[in-house]
Amino acid sequence: LKTLNIIKPDDWHLHLREGLVLKNIIQFTSEYFGRAIVMPNTKSPITSINSAISYRKSIVEALPESSKFEPLMTIYLTDDTDKGELINGFKNNVFFAAKLYPANATTNSSHGVRKIENLYKIFELMQDSGMPLLIHGEVTDSEVDVFDREEVFIDKELSQITKRFPKLKIVLEHITTSYAVDFVQENNIGATITPHHLHINRNAMFFGGLNSDFYCLPVAKRENNRLALR
């Protein structure tokens, strides 16, 4: 096989947000993608079956007429996530996956998890049920350099999760480092990569001044990391 034509791919990491932003983005996404995993970090995070159903309804209502686009909903994990809500939502096809945000790691993540090991019972249930875990893989400790947050997260948190739950379906989201590439290849997990991190290295943020348009979380890294991602 020399050529693979993907007629209508899936988007495995989509932020639709809310209101007018949602209505604008969904027009473009539904034109080019058949399905998408919808991130749950809205201003009021998607933490329950009812909130996921309501959010999905607003997405479907914003779709162009005759669109067959399918939004795949996720639940936002918190320190207080209800085990029954999580598993019932997955078994009844409300949730496609669960998303782990370390608290304050990125946009609308203030409700995220503050101590990941407190979710180990949740992870065990997810492993047993086959529910995927999607992870924003960065620590938020103030003493850790912003460019090292992914690597430290892998060593401190993800390595422990993969050892304790070897059959848990894990996706390390939007990886940015060669360290993450190596970890994914050496372990039974998947990863997503953004076009942004394939296209630029961290120099782009500072070349000729401060270029805020190139800033995102996780931040872009050195050129050797960009090449490893490619």
Language model regions located:
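Short, glycine-rich nucleotide/cofactor-binding loops
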Residues: 14-18
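Divalent metal-dependent hydrolysis catalytic cores, especially in the metallo-beta-lactamase
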Residues: 10-12, 25-51, 66-78, 94-108, ...
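Catalytic-loop motifs flanking and including active-site residues across diverse enzymes
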Residues: 21, 25, 225
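Histidine-rich, glycine-flanked metal-binding segment
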Residues: 1-5
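N-terminal cationic-hydrophobic initiation segments that often serve targeting/anchoring roles
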Residues: 30, 56, 60-63, 90, ...
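Generic structural signal for well-ordered alpha-helices
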Residues: 26, 49-60, 86, 119-123, ...
